[in-house]
């Protein structure tokens, strides 16, 4: 099976292709620009993206949106994670967290899949904490400052396989693949 992944983020493509490729699913990246609305929930961003893209890109296609939600910052950066990363970066988040005792945070991923005129969503959440400093060279985005529960490593200190086993995106991909097995008999 071939799925078109609409994203300009090569890190996401590597993770998705690594996970789904083990099941013989080919991921083809399409860098088709589409508006990302500012909404309160990742699900709304994905719904809008699918609605905008259908009929403009080949099927079946998928999109993914994710966010980092930090408890002591009342869920910030959340749905604005991409914008915040581009503007204040990891250094800005670490500065905002200076002196914070509560470093709990979670990543959430929402995958949207469109096939045969229907849209489906799959999500995954990973709890963890924000480190005191950047660590690691793998991954992308907030990976160097996020330590998932049950680990002492940041996502950026893990191999792609280790990260996919624990990450929000890995959990969403697992739910997606389970759905594919049942509904498309894959």
Swiss-Prot record:
Cofactor binding summary note: Binds 1 divalent metal cation per subunit; can use either Mg(2+) or Mn(2+).
Top EC class for this record: hydrolase
UniProt-listed Enzyme Commission number(s): 3.6.1.66
Residues that coordinate or bind substrate: 7-12, 66, 140-143, 163, 168-169
Gene3D superfamilies, sorted: 3.90.950.10
Cofactor(s) listed in the protein's UniProt record: Mg(2+); Mn(2+)
GO molecular function annotations of the record: dITP diphosphatase activity; ITP diphosphatase activity; metal ion binding; nucleotide binding; ribonucleoside triphosphate phosphatase activity; XTP diphosphatase activity
GO cellular component, one term: cytoplasm
Gene Ontology terms: biological process: nucleotide metabolic process; purine nucleoside triphosphate catabolic process
Keyword Membrane: no
InterPro entries listed in its UniProt record: dITP/XTP_pyrophosphatase, ITPase-like_fam, RdgB/HAM1
Reactions that this protein is recorded to catalyse: XTP + H2O = XMP + diphosphate + H(+); dITP + H2O = dIMP + diphosphate + H(+); ITP + H2O = IMP + diphosphate + H(+)
Family as reported in the entry's similarity comment: Belongs to the HAM1 NTPase family.
HAMAP family: Non_canon_purine_NTPase
Known function: Pyrophosphatase that catalyzes the hydrolysis of nucleoside triphosphates to their monophosphate derivatives, with a high preference for the non-canonical purine nucleotides XTP (xanthosine triphosphate), dITP (deoxyinosine triphosphate) and ITP. Seems to function as a house-cleaning enzyme that removes non-canonical purine nucleotides from the nucleotide pool, thus preventing their incorporation into DNA/RNA and avoiding chromosomal lesions.
Protein name: dITP/XTP pyrophosphatase
Organism of this sequence: Pyrococcus horikoshii (strain ATCC 700860 / DSM 12428 / JCM 9974 / NBRC 100139 / OT-3)
